[in-house]
């Protein structure tokens, strides 16, 4: 592996191979994702998630922070707030929510946990 490959991962979103999303339980084929730095064992890192029109996430709780940026489309959160392209949202550790989209959307997700102490 080249030095660049060890230090940087570039995702060409148009050519990325998205996989069915399964981080919140059962496979959700209407939601796909592409890991960038996500580590399943540590439950943190970044990824891009695509939700097809009509897709709904399962209700879930976060052990750490979940931040995301709407890249395309609109996403409605469980409290009814509509998030649009350019909106950035941050959920605190222990928070729970679910979301859905009528239009379809693409989001960049960043899950992280603060250092203990």
Label every model-predicted segment.
Residues 53, 62-78:
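Glycine- and acidic-residue-biased ligand/ion/polar-headgroup-sensing regions
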Residues 77-97:
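Short acidic-glycine-tyrosine-enriched beta hairpin
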Residues 30-62, 92-96:
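Conserved short histidine dyad/triad with adjacent acidic residue
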């Amino acid at each position: 592996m080249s030095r660049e490959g060890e230090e940087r991962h570039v995702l060409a979103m148009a050519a990325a191979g998205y996989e069915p999303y399964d981080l919140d339980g059962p496979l959700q084929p209407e939601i796909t994702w592409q890991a960038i730095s996500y580590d399943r064992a540590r439950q943190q890192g970044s990824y891009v998630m695509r939700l097809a029109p009509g897709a709904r996430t399962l209700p879930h709780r976060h052990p750490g922070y979940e931040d995301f940026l709407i890249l395309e489309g609109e996403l409605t959160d469980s409290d009814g707030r509509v998030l649009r392209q350019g909106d950035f949202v941050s959920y605190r550790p222990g928070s729970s929510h679910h979301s859905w989209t009528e239009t379809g959307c693409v989001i960049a997700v960043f899950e992280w946990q603060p250092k203990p102490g």
